[in-house]
Amino acid sequence: MANFDGQTAVITGGAQGIGFATAKRLINDGCDVMIWDIDEKLGLETSKKLNCQFLKVDQTDNKAVQEATDKTIKQMDKIDILVCSAGIAGPTYTTWDYPVEEWSKVFNVNVNGVFYCNKYVVKTMRDKGYGRIINIASIAGKEGNPNASAYSASKAAVIGLTKSLGKETASQDIAVNCITPATAKTRILDQVSQEFIDYMISKIPRNRFVTVEEIASLIAFLASKENSFTTAGVFDISGGRATY
């Protein structure tokens, strides 16, 4: 178990799902956590439950993310760790039937939002000479899921962003990595059909969902000082589904 005493973390989408489990894990390991989430009601409930701080942030708004970064620095003095967990699945359509507005919505949240968070937070890390960034991608970003081209392509973009930023910051003690989990049982599944859920489980040799706690354990290592060498990496947690 890593020791995060004296460290601070920002977790986007921290009010639920993977973000919530990660916030809980890091707090239990001694970290001071600030949750960024668009759901104010749930975010405030989570902050009380976990005894952490909360900011309502729409990560698709470039200016809002910049302001949230400034507010967080004022409140917490620094940001040692950034976990980008906020994301959406989007609807399930074939690529030729995919509504353009829905495609844009998925990319705005999953790609632009992650870019904004990485962009502004990493600047503060470069000033301090230390940081850990973990972006939540997906096995879909490596393999591509049928009827989920927007989600799959957006998560592939997160992998590419992670690799680029990791190389750009490698000369400092800043590690930028992403993880590619299989499906976890979170509210994001409310956005897709049961047929699609059954398909995803059928592709996992473990024959079950990954738990959010299992994902949080991997994130905790990547967020720790023990992860002192690996950067620009893609860490699989797909229960055997990944082919590379």
Where do the language-model regions lie?
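Short C-terminal tail/terminal secondary-structure segment
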Residues: 89-92, 143, 231-244
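Residue(s) in the substrate-gating loop at a strand-loop-helix junction
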Residues: 138
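A conserved structural motif in NAD(P)-dependent oxidoreductases
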Residues: 204-215, 226
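Alpha-helical segment proximal to the catalytic Tyr-Lys
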Residues: 123, 167-171, 228
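Active-site helix of classical SDR
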Residues: 118, 154, 162
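Active-site loop immediately N-terminal to the catalytic Tyr-X3-Lys motif
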Residues: 96, 143-149, 171-172, 207, ...
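Substrate-binding pocket helix/loop in short-chain dehydrogenase/reductase
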Residues: 93-95, 99-104, 189, 200
